[in-house]
């Protein structure tokens, strides 16, 4: 593009006049700095202006030229978020024309909760630093947790291995090769005792990332506490218990959706009666994003699942204000800092509206979208792994600026395996540096009122409502999942993202740009080759030392409850107290409920 073409471009964009002399001066500045000469030796011909240089010329010209009413329409090159939301070069007050800050923004801790769920947010206390951890044996995970607590972690978060997630004991043939690999292996109440050894369960909160077998793990946790003389009413924590996203994004489901929803709502009712301070679900967008969704899809599909859980609980006989205050959410913090901040703010505002208008909630606590955040695991790269420290820092910062209640920062080595102790410590220190050194905790919602952030928040929300309307038209989240709608949308988004990385239009430093060819040595977390055999021996002894007839009778009560309408967690707890294993309880429900196989 020549100077005449550049001036014409600006004129066509809606400017009443174009000061060509000022523009020529800006162009001359670039020539004087040698930038155009360098460009001419590259792929742009003589007399042509490269896009980056054109961008600098426009920026310098704008500093000299009075602002026009159409300034926001000028772009040297079009920019969009991964959702396709256009990003302008400059945002002004005109981009928020007609926008009512009292209605759309409000005050922190008050409707519509855009600015946060609590009036003082981090001025009151920092977010909970809850580092996700779990691997190998219960003893090994217990030691890692104690290390994290000693280094300043303020909450626990447990990762379970795949057999535990899928309801198989460690000696089951289908567990072979997976025991303790991606999380801790928990089969029995003895395992849970070892996992929680020496931890003050009445003083800390524990989050458990578990879904199909959520009820079993929660009950084992409760039984251990009771064995120590700690009443269930003093226990605090969160159970993920979000089975719908398993059908959409992860795949660790066991039973058909509708039977799984019964387990979810039975857990709601059980906790309301017996474990009142426990968050009964963590409605999860994290895994939806990890599967390849966009930020808008993450919001829309997660809130759609949330609507389905509320509807199911009401259908099960619970009043909305009896359970909704214990609902929580779990989001991903991805790479685009401002889009992520907008996502968190939009989701909070949308949920308050859903609970008020759709479900008639009157307790303000029922309207609060309280959430945990984890930095985006899928963004980490095996190439130049130290770069991941920077990625994690920016992602964690977006979660804090977006008002998270708790946060996990990934280890920089998680693209190649479980985090080493060093990587876990660096991740925790990342959170502590943000909290103690950056100043972001000093004022609530520091980005409020930004022309860009508020415009982006509005755009994310508007597009998410469009998705929710489509899902409602399909009959709700369960019907949309059964029809494959969410899965198809995520697949298309994931393909588009991968294609952009492949063709270089989406830059990933160290992967498709700034590749130096140097292989950086990296310590890899070692797995225990003796664990699987050792777990099998433990299970053999465990079964031999218990009252087999008592276990069988207790499991029959679980089966009878599954055939009826009784809350399943009551007989499940009795069976686990009789020393039934996780796999045995799950097998009873497999026989009664069947297992789910997706169509096609």
Predicted region positions:
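Short acidic, hydrophobic short linear motifs in intrinsically disordered regions
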Residues: 2-10
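Short, basic interhelical loop/turn and adjoining N-cap
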Residues: 12-18, 581
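Charged low-complexity interaction tracts in eukaryotic proteins
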Residues: 16-58
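Catalytic alpha/beta active-site cores
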Residues: 61-334, 339-340, 358, 365-372, ...
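Flexible, glycine-rich loop/tail regions that form catalytic "lids" or insertion modules at the edges
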Residues: 71-72, 77-98, 107-111, 162, ...
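Short beta-alpha connecting loops at secondary-structure transitions
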Residues: 177-181, 245-255, 288-293, 331-339, ...
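Phosphate/diphosphate-binding loops
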Residues: 187, 205, 210-213, 225-227, ...
């Amino acid at each position: 593009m020549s100077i005449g073409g550049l001036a014409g471009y600006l004129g066509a964009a809606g400017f009443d006049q174009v000061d060509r002399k000022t523009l020529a001066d800006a162009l001359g500045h670039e020539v004087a700095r040698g930038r155009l000469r360098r460009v001419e030796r590259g792929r742009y011909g003589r007399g042509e202006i490269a896009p980056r240089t054109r961008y600098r010329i426009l920026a310098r010209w704008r500093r000299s030229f009075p602002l026009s009413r159409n300034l926001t329409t000028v772009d040297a090159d079009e920019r969009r978020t991964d959702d396709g939301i256009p990003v302008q070069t400059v945002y002004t007050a005109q981009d928020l024309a007609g926008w009512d800050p009292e209605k759309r923004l409000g005050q922190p801790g008050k409707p519509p909760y855009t600015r946060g769920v609590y009036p003082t947010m981090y001025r009151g206390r920092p977010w909970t630093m809850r580092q996700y951890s779990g691997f190998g044996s219960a003893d090994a995970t217990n030691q890692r947790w104690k290390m994290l607590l000693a280094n300043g972690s303020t909450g626990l978060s447990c990762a379970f291995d795949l057999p535990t997630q899928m309801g198989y004991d460690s000696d089951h043939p289908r567990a072979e090769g997976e025991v303790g690999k991606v999380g801790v292996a928990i089969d029995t109440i003895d395992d849970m005792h070892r996992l929680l050894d020496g931890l003050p369960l009445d003083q800390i909160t524990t989050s458990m990332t578990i879904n199909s077998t959520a009820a079993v793990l929660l009950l084992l946790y409760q039984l251990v506490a009771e064995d120590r003389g700690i009443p269930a009413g003093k226990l605090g924590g969160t159970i993920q218990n979000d089975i719908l996203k398993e059908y959409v994004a992860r795949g660790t489901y066991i039973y058909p959706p509708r039977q799984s929803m019964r387990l979810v709502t039975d857990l709601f009712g059980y906790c309301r009666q017996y474990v009142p301070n426990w968050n009964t679900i963590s409605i999860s967008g994290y895994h939806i994003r990890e599967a390849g969704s966009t930020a808008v899809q993450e919001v829309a599909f997660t809130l759609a699942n949330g609507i389905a859980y509320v509807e199911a609980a009401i259908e099960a006989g619970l009043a909305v204000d009896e359970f909704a205050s214990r609902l929580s959410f779990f989001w991903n913090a991805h790479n685009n800092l401002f889009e992520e901040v907008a996502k968190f703010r939009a989701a909070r505002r949308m949920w308050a509206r859903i609970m008020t208008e759709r479900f008639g909630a009157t307790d303000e606590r029922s309207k609060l979208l309280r959430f945990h955040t984890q930095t985006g695991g899928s963004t980490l790269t095996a190439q130049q792994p130290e770069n991941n420290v920077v990625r994690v820092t920016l992602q964690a910062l977006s979660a804090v600026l977006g008002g998270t209640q708790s946060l996990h920062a990934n280890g920089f080595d998680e693209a190649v395996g479980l985090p080493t102790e060093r990587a876990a410590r660096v991740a925790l220190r990342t959170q502590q540096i943000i909290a103690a050194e950056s100043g972001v905790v000093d004022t609530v919602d520091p980005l409020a009122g930004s022309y860009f952030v508020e415009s982006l928040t509005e755009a994310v929300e508007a597009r998410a409502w469009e998705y929710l309307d489509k899902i409602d038209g399909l009959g709700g989240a369960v019907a949309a999942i059964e029809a494959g709608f969410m899965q198809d949308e995520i697949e298309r988004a994931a393909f588009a993202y991968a294609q952009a990385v492949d063709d270089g239009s989406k830059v990933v430093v160290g992967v498709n740009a700034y590749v130096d060819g140097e292989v950086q040595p990296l310590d890899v977390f070692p797995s225990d080759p003796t664990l699987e055999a050792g777990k099998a021996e433990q299970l053999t002894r465990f079964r031999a030392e218990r009252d087999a007839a008592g276990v069988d009778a207790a499991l029959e009560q679980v089966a009878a409850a599954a055939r009826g309408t009784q809350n399943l967690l009551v007989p499940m707890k009795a069976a686990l107290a009789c020393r039934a294993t996780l796999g045995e309880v799950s097998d009873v429900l497999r026989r009664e409920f069947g297992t789910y196989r997706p169509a096609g």
